[in-house]
């Protein structure tokens, strides 16, 4: 949910709530029923056949994939002020595309370039913040991949990796 929220993957029914950003985040995770708002939480699914679950991000046809907010960098700066060396971790573009539910007529292919641009911006902001390492988790790589899946992965990371200057990427 953190990475989806960072990329503005917020369904319209949650955007319509007259609540703070934090309350919107929790509404997506737990639902919201007060002050005239009534939305259920996003669906949950098992995380790669484990007993852990994740909240399924929903992408609507008019979803504008872009970096939204500064939580990732704010938390990094907070740790830095406490003299804690840390490395931000985000879900990778390939995995996030595979885990999202597309609710309209558009498919993952329609959003690939927007994801690439958003991840490039994340890396650029990490460079600007002096972040030495950004960990990008791609657990979907453990699944069987078709030739089309491999092409998608190569397309994403050949373009994303071009965005970095000094920030190193730990892809796992």
Where do the language-model regions lie?
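Domain-level signal for soluble alpha/beta catalytic cores
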Residues: 1-172
